[in-house]
Amino acid sequence: MASNFNDIVKQGYVKIRSRKLGIFRRCWLVFKKASSKGPRRLEKFPDEKAAYFRNFHKVTELHNIKNITRLPRETKKHAVAIIFHDETSKTFACESELEAEEWCKHLCMECLGTRLNDISLGEPDLLAAGVQREQNERFNVYLMPTPNLDIYGECTMQITHENIYLWDIHNAKVKLVMWPLSSLRRYGRDSTWFTFESGRMCDTGEGLFTFQTREGEMIYQKVHSATLAIAEQHERLMLEMEQKARLQTSLTEPMTLSKSISLPRSAYWHHITRQNSVGEIYSLQGHGFGSSKMSRAQTFPSYAPEQSEEAQQPLSRSSSYGFSYSSSLIQ
């Protein structure tokens, strides 16, 4: 994990063709890798001083790139072309052949995941596509300092159907920490943050973890979908156990229940699928199931400025940031 992470891959003076005048103009170009501050992109400034003070600049996000190539010398000397899948392109010329090669190499490595000196004339690497897909499914986040962990900084977040993982930004194979989705108490987001509260069953123990990211909404939706699936699986198992208990009770046989899945450690996530309602939670009593009712936890509503103070009182300290939470009770 990098607390002093630098997202600048390469920068320098180049010449970019003006769309209005059709002539090449000199500017300062900065290539930044994907991070918690934003996606992979090119930032164009009038000069180096403007880049230092972060003055007005134009940004080109590097998504859906089809190819990155060098242009023939007769077309434009020391030129690099970025070709997108929609057949549009962006071309710039460097001040030397060495600079052009450097720009092309870094762009290919970051945007296409390849190295110029890699020669793959034999059979295709069947694992490469899967590895690349897994890398693309990770989100760039910045873990804010917290007393529960001795690490913080830039990293990548992966969300599976059961867990949340943090991976090292420099070595994608190094796992930093893991939280089971079933042990989260609540989670929320806004446009630049994602946060969740872990329960005591997690390796980190109880605590609030906050991440700075431009992909807070996407992370939230993926976590929420996974927790819904866990809740539905839990509900299906409870129904199967109830039916089996009733059948064995009617046959006056001893009841033996096998646990087919690992149930969420947090107590009853039914509120995720049915918010602001009361539902039945079955508990095993003797050889059968007796049903008792208990109020489900409330899913925190989205922040609204016009809310009264009384409506905001149930929210926790972290909700003052404007996050919309989904919550569950921890046993």
Curated annotation (Swiss-Prot):
- Modification after translation (UniProt): On Ret activation, phosphorylated on one or more C-terminal tyrosine residues by an Src family kinase.
| Tissue specificity remark | Highly expressed in fetal and adult brain. Highly expressed in the cerebellum. Weak expression in kidney, spinal cord and testis.
Q: Which GO terms describe its cellular component?
A: cytoplasm; cytosol
Q: Where is this region: Disordered?
A: 293-331
Physiological role: DOK proteins are enzymatically inert adaptor or scaffolding proteins. They provide a docking platform for the assembly of multimolecular signaling complexes. DOK6 promotes Ret-mediated neurite growth. May have a role in brain development and/or maintenance.
Keyword Protease carried by entry: no
Alphabetical list of Pfam families matching this protein: IRS, PH
Q: Where is this motif: DKFBH motif?
A: 263-273
Per its record, how is this protein called by name? Answer: Docking protein 6
Assigned protein family: Belongs to the DOK family. Type B subfamily.
GO BP annotations, alphabetical order: cell surface receptor protein tyrosine kinase signaling pathway
- Keywords in alphabetical order, please: Phosphoprotein
Residues of the IRS-type PTB domain? 132-237
Q: Which organism is it from?
A: Homo sapiens (Human)
Q: Where is the PH domain?
A: 8-112
Give the source lineage, highest ranks first: Eukaryota, Metazoa, Chordata, Craniata, Vertebrata
